[in-house]
């Protein structure tokens, strides 16, 4: 019997979590909460508007820990981090809500979104329509669908549920086969290429560059994971990739927003402030 990969372990636990949550709060109750939530802020539109200007469209991630690195940030106050990112020039936020493997929480998404005006994606392992409705009830503006975690029928079902509750969808791929499935199954404009292999957790920026020629121009490519310095940013920009999802590089910095500005908008200079998070 083969040893389960990290992704397989996460998905097995996620199925248990969905069962536990749906036993506590019914889908009908969640749908009522979703209808009462603040109007979506337009996640895809915000990225598209920035990319049209050939300016970095940064999805800045709020992430306390990961399976490969353990705790990444000890001083973890989502509202403060969100404000710092907004000031530093982020276009959108990504908030980890997975509890068991990333030490995330639903409340972190709510706190971050309430602290700023940026659109927010719920970063989690979505496998069930329940989680999609739950995301909207929490106030999310977008959800992540990971092709490696879903078959085509479920992927299409989750995207349809997302559309029904007013959520944008970011579909994430890791290789050519997944890209082909995503393009065939979903019409979302947002295609994320994760440079981290979710089975081994190794990172290679060439993943984005290799897949780029196969992605139609009308889709917006978001490069995810492994962007650590200006050279990485410039490598993507000369290839016409202007949208980035970055977490760890910011989370390890004393001031996440200042690090965002240093990495993506160096011409603005780095803000000077007494606060470690401003």
From Swiss-Prot:
Native species: Pseudomonas fluorescens (strain ATCC BAA-477 / NRRL B-23932 / Pf-5)
Matches recorded under PROSITE patterns: IGPS (PS00614)
Reaction equations catalysed: 1-(2-carboxyphenylamino)-1-deoxy-D-ribulose 5-phosphate + H(+) = (1S,2R)-1-C-(indol-3-yl)glycerol 3-phosphate + CO2 + H2O
Family: Belongs to the TrpC family.
Gene Ontology molecular function terms on file: indole-3-glycerol-phosphate synthase activity; phosphoribosylanthranilate isomerase activity
UniProt keyword list: Amino-acid biosynthesis, Aromatic amino acid biosynthesis, Decarboxylase, Lyase, Tryptophan biosynthesis
Any Pfam family hit: IGPS
Domain of life: Bacteria
Official protein name in the record: Indole-3-glycerol phosphate synthase
Top-level class of the enzyme under EC nomenclature: lyase
Recorded metabolic or biological pathway in which this protein acts: Amino-acid biosynthesis; L-tryptophan biosynthesis; L-tryptophan from chorismate: step 4/5
Enzyme Commission code(s) on record: 4.1.1.48
One GO process term, biological-process aspect: L-tryptophan biosynthetic process
Signal peptide (from-to): none
Native organism taxonomy: Bacteria, Pseudomonadati, Pseudomonadota, Gammaproteobacteria, Pseudomonadales
Family annotation (InterPro entries): Aldolase_TIM, Indole-3-glycerol_P_synth, Indole-3-glycerol_P_synth_dom, Indole-3-GlycerolPSynthase_CS, RibuloseP-bd_barrel
């Amino acid at each position: 019997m083969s040893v389960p990969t990290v992704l397989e372990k996460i998905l097995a636990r996620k199925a248990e979590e969905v069962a536990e949550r749906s036993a506590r709060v019914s889908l009908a109750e969640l749908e009522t909460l979703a209808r009462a939530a603040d109007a979506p802020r337009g996640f895809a539109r915000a990225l598209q508007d920035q990319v049209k200007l050939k300016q970095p469209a940064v999805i800045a991630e709020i992430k306390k820990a990961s399976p490969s690195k353990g705790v990444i940030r000890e001083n973890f106050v989502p509202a403060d981090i969100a404000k710092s990112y907004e000031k530093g020039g982020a276009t959108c936020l990504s908030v980890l809500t997975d509890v068991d493997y990333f030490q995330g929480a639903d409340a972190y998404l709510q706190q971050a979104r309430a602290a700023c005006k940026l659109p927010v994606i719920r970063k989690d392992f979505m496998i069930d329509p329940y989680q999609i409705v739950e995301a909207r009830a929490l106030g999310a503006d977008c959800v992540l669908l990971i092709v490696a975690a879903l078959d085509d029928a479920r992927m299409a079902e989750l995207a349809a549920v997302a559309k029904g509750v007013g959520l944008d969808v970011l579909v994430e791929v890791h290789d050519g086969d997944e890209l082909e499935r995503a393009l065939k199954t979903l019409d979302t404009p947002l295609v994320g290429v994760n440079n981290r292999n979710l089975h081994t957790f190794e990172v290679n920026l060439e993943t984005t560059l290799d897949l780029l020629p196969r992605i139609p121009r009308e889709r917006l490519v978001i490069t995810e994971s492994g962007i650590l310095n200006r050279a990485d940013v410039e490598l993507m920009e000369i290839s016409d990739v202007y949208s980035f999802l970055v977490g760890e590089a910011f989370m390890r910095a004393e001031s996440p927003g200042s690090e965002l500005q240093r990495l993506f908008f160096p011409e603005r200079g780095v803000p000077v402030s007494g606060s470690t998070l401003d």
